[in-house]
Amino acid sequence: MAGFLMKQMVGNQLNEVTGGLGLKDDGGEKTETGEDPEVVAARLEQEERRKEKHRKMEQEREKMRQGIRDKYAIKKKEEGVAMDFTEGRIGGPRKTPEEIAAEMNAEDDSIIGQLGLTEQVEKAKTMATGAFETVKGFFPFGK
């Protein structure tokens, strides 16, 4: 522990002295990130070479895949096409709650309409809702 503290104190003092004498390393121009422009240019060139190599490898792989597809008569999968899973389903397609409610209303209307009871059903509905509202007013949870 004592050795570490001594190195820190001596090192800091030594850095101050050399900095004061102008012995700092001014290794050329620095960019915003603190790197030489040559290093940045070399890194960009290396990245471009890597991307080009990757593109060529992917082309070769695709050519190989296409050869296999041709050999075994396999169709290429299209990513944009959505799969239709309804044909493998045991039951029919599911209906939304709105579709079910519409069917129920259509059935009710047709039976009631056939019997000529639409006016009586509407009266019964209004009386039931009025009674419900009246009863709801008596209970504390209905307010």
UniProtKB/Swiss-Prot annotation:
Database matches in InterPro entries: Synaphin (IPR008849)
Organism of provenance: Caenorhabditis briggsae
- Specify one Pfam family: Synaphin
Q: Where is the composition biased (Basic and acidic residues)?
A: 23-33, 44-71
Could you give one GO CC term from the UniProt record? cytosol
The protein in question is named Putative complexin-1
Family membership, please give it. Answer: Belongs to the complexin/synaphin family.
* PANTHER family tied to this protein: COMPLEXIN
Cellular location(s): Cytoplasm, Cytosol
Q: Name the job this protein performs.
A: Positively regulates a late step in synaptic vesicle exocytosis.
Coiled-coil stretches, from where to where?
40-71
Q: Where is this region: Disordered?
A: 15-71
GO terms (molecular function) for this protein are: SNARE binding; syntaxin binding
Give the keywords, sorted: Coiled coil, Cytoplasm, Exocytosis, Neurotransmitter transport, Transport
